[in-house]
């Protein structure tokens, strides 16, 4: 029996737009740091590479990595300024269909967010989008390993058993494979591929020499969650 619904945040509940990275330009200018287009692109790429090299989010580690990757010496204040700017990057209103899903799930289950980012910034974005009230807790990647590692999901289940929790997310490797391997249930939100919508699929989980098939759902619209839960 499902007791807790765990939502991924970016591109599941609200969009993360490519243009948000333009805040790097603004932050550099406000800090009076000279830069070229190549510098901007390297910093942008460094954020992605950081996630491939580190499993938690730490400001000191992040700026050290960016400086090593870009061969520059940016101040830690750059990260702090970017976090402040990105915390405002959220729509002020979400689609009514998303609100209905949140109201529905909150009326039946414990509802939380599991994000691969800093908690403070994500809470502010949820507040701006006016949906923070739907969540019992926001779990982030500052004090434990991020998705797809088991530790991320174990913190998000709270006092529940893994099988009593279901993860909803758009990243198959991080959200779906990660949660299934940790023993949770999953709904794969795949808005770009309607052919897979409403299908029940099976993930082959290999444990030593045994292979176990685990059921998960695929949807193309968030409102389909109400037909599953």
Go through each PLM region and give its residues:
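Asp-based, Mg2+/Mn2+-dependent phosphohydrolase catalytic module
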Residues: 1-3, 103, 112, 117-229
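Active-site neighborhood of HAD-like aspartate-dependent phosphohydrolases
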Residues: 1-42
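Generic recognition of short, well-ordered alpha-helical segments
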Residues: 18-22, 96, 100, 124, ...
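Hydrophobic alpha-helical core bundles mediating ligand binding, dimerization, or RNAP-core interactions
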Residues: 20-28, 44-47, 82-86, 122, ...
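An amphipathic alpha-helix signature
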Residues: 21-25, 59-63, 119
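Short, surface-exposed acidic
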Residues: 31-45, 70-82, 133-134
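A metal-dependent, Asp-based hydrolase signature
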Residues: 48-84, 96
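Short, acidic loop-to-helix structural element flanking the phosphoryl-transfer center
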Residues: 60, 84-112, 150
């Amino acid at each position: 029996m499902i007791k807790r619904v765990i939502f991924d945040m970016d591109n599941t509940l609200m969009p993360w737009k490519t243009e948000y990275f333009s805040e790097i330009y603004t932050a550099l200018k406000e800090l009076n740091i000279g830069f070229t287009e190549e510098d901007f692109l390297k910093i942008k790429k460094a954020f992605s590479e950081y996630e491939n090299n580190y499993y938690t989010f730490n400001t000191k580690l992040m700026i050290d990595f960016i400086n090593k990757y870009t061969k520059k010496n940016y101040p830690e204040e750059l990260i702090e300024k970017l976090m402040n700017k990105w915390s405002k990057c959220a729509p002020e209103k979400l689609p009514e269909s998303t609100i209905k899903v949140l109201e529905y799930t909150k009326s039946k289950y414990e509802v939380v967010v599991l994000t691969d980012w800093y908690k403070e910034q994500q809470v502010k974005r949820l507040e701006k989008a006016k949906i923070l009230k739907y969540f019992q807790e926001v779990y982030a990647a500052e004090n434990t390993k991020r998705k797809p590692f088991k530790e991320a999901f174990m913190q998000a289940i709270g006092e529940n058993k893994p099988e009593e929790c279901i993860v909803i997310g758009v990243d198959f490797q991080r959200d779906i494979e990660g949660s299934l391997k940790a023993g949770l249930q999953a709904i794969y939100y795949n808005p770009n591929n309607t052919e897979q919508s409403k299908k029940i699929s099976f993930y082959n989980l290999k444990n030593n020499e045994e292979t176990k098939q685990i059921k998960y759902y695929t949807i193309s619209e968030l409102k389909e969650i109400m037909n599953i839960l």
